[in-house]
């Protein structure tokens, strides 16, 4: 196989991408990971991860992603900290171009694991206090707000769900929405309204997030009167949706209206030989552990597909690796 041709090329370096790489490399598939310039994905912005199995004392998001990368690299996965700027999935081998090189990389199969990002308001305080009280995931971080007061911005089902999750821990949740009416479904809205810990502040926009080293409050403005006030809160949660990082694959694979990659069969996309894993195709869970599981499944699907095409004859099943192979890999 030429130096520029791989059995599997994985685009993305979060839990899904690194897990896919681990399984691919351990199956003796020639594997390349385009990590992108944001190595590790959204977990690089997470201070404490306490809901991933195996880290009983919790772990910093960046440290966790370092572990993922090292484990995949240990078995021979090649890493490149480059963004993919163009792909051609119209014929095989597939071709992918990075921003660093004019010549393409060739792939017998591709796993899309580019993830999705929470939408933000674009406030200076959001980026400055990211992971220091600013979050886009209540399921991930609600535990840290026991007995505290938090603000949630949004008006759809996501906002109602985030507020409800936070209310299990926080003493008070203020749900802020710029309109008087909500896009949320009736049942989700009623559930939030009936929760005594959740208060609603409508017709209001957030002007700034306050605090030096951690969130201390938010400055809000009434859209009707222009009157401003400061709310003292310990945390701020954006719940205005997510944006999948799929623009480079636009027109290459089928996506839904939100830009999420459509999985036609298991993890395979509309293009045979191209698979999707993690938040890039997950509109519901968006958890590190589910993304990692997706990465595992995508590689298993890719390996089986390659075998069906007669292109993975030399690949070994991870389940039948010999002790000698394990010892060799441990010394890498």
What is each of the regions a protein language model found here?
Residues 102-200, 209-211:
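Predominantly flavin-linked oxidoreductase catalytic cores and closely associated redox partners
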Residues 160-162, 271, 280-328:
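A conserved FAD-binding loop/helix module that cradles the flavin
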Residues 72-99, 105-107, 167-264, 304-332:
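A Rossmann-like FAD-binding core segment of flavoenzymes
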Residues 5, 122, 128-144, 239-287, ...:
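FAD-site-proximal beta/loop scaffold in flavoenzymes
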Residues 6-75, 148, 160-186, 201, ...:
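Beta1-alpha1 glycine-rich phosphate/pyrophosphate-binding loop at the start
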Residues 14-15, 38, 116-118, 157-158, ...:
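Residue-level detector of alpha-helix initiation sites
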